[in-house]
């Protein structure tokens, strides 16, 4: 019940504040400040921070529906990343900077500079929490050399050696086997689940409304088959994404995240393709809202690793990290009480 309250609060806020018009405006270079301030004032950004540190002290499982709502509304600011970053910083006893925080894995160059490519939603973030070979750095976006990446709000960032040395280096400790990519993959899987559901619902509504040859196109068997395949992908992905957020505290289970991100990334291509096939040419137009979601499906599919990467992680766990049968591994992974 408490989880539903958080999800309902997120849904109501995003319906009013994260409209398609605002998403378009931010993508076109408009300021995200008003939207971010609304999220900050509602307390979502500190939801994973322990209560003794001024947050709500929630666990990942309690925020699945919030992240799913963020995906369904194509939220153009790094809310989920900020939640994770602030929780990690609080756990390390480090100061939490104001504003939105993106997450990235960085590569230290021989000259000491730090490269991050791409940084998801880095164009609308104030800071970036970077994991690299020597630990962690918390760096301001304003100081970085910035280049555009494939998705309009993602960027490639570079900081000089002097900037890296001067930046805070929080002593963040992750449990064995976890890294920043795993944390972000669990978040992105939840957002993919929300976007997939929204695309499916919009497509289903369109199929029921669009008339052709005297009846809704949803009455034609070929369209019904496409919708059935979409629903299979959408609900399987949602179950997997919820599994990726299962457990207590801030840290997910890496194998469960692998299952979640692989299944959601796999569904992204199939659902986007079917949605545009059913909508026809109109679905590709800039004025139609469907593209706000399907562009994100394609971008998020690759964020923090595509299905190929996470299938490899799951396969390695089966071959090298598990002594029992395949069925035993499936049972232990999908038992969310474990």
Task: Enumerate the language-model features and the residues they cover.
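Alpha-helical interface subdomain recognition
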Residues: 1-73, 185-338
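A cross-family signal for key residues in well-ordered alpha-helices
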Residues: 67, 86-87
């Amino acid at each position: 019940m408490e989880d539903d309250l958080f999800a309902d609060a997120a849904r109501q806020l995003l319906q009013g504040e994260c409209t398609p018009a605002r998403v378009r405006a931010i993508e076109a270079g408009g300021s995200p400040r008003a939207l971010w301030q609304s999220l900050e004032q509602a307390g979502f950004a500190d939801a994973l921070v322990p209560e003794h540190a001024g947050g709500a002290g929630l666990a990942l499982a309690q925020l699945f529906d919030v992240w799913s709502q963020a995906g369904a509304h194509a939220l153009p600011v790094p809310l989920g990343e900020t939640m994770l970053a602030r929780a990690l910083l609080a756990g390390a006893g480090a100061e939490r900077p104001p504003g939105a925080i993106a997450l990235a894995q960085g590569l230290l160059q021989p000259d000491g500079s730090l490269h991050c490519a791409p940084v998801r939603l880095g164009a609308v973030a104030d800071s970036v929490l970077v994991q690299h070979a020597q630990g962690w750095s918390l760096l301001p976006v304003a100081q970085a050399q910035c280049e555009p990446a494939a998705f309009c709000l993602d960027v490639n960032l570079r900081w000089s050696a002097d900037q890296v040395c001067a930046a805070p280096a929080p002593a963040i400790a992750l449990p064995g086997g976890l890294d920043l990519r795993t944390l972000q993959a669990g978040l992105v899987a939840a957002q993919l689940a929300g976007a997939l559901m929204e695309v499916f619902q919009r497509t289903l509504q369109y199929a029921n409304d669009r008339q052709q040859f005297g009846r809704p196109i949803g009455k034609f068997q070929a369209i019904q088959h496409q919708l059935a395949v979409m629903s299979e992908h959408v609900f399987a992905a949602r179950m997997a994404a919820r599994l990726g957020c299962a457990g207590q505290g801030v840290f997910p289970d890496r194998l469960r995240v692998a299952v979640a991100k692989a299944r959601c990334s796999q569904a992204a291509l199939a659902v986007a393709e079917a949605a545009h096939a059913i909508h026809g040419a109109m679905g590709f137009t800039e004025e139609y809202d469907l593209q706000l979601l399907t562009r994100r499906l394609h971008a998020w599919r690759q964020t923090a690793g595509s299905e190929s990467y996470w299938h490899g992680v799951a396969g390695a766990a089966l071959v090298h990290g598990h002594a029992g049968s395949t069925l035993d591994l499936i049972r232990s992974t999908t038992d969310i009480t474990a």
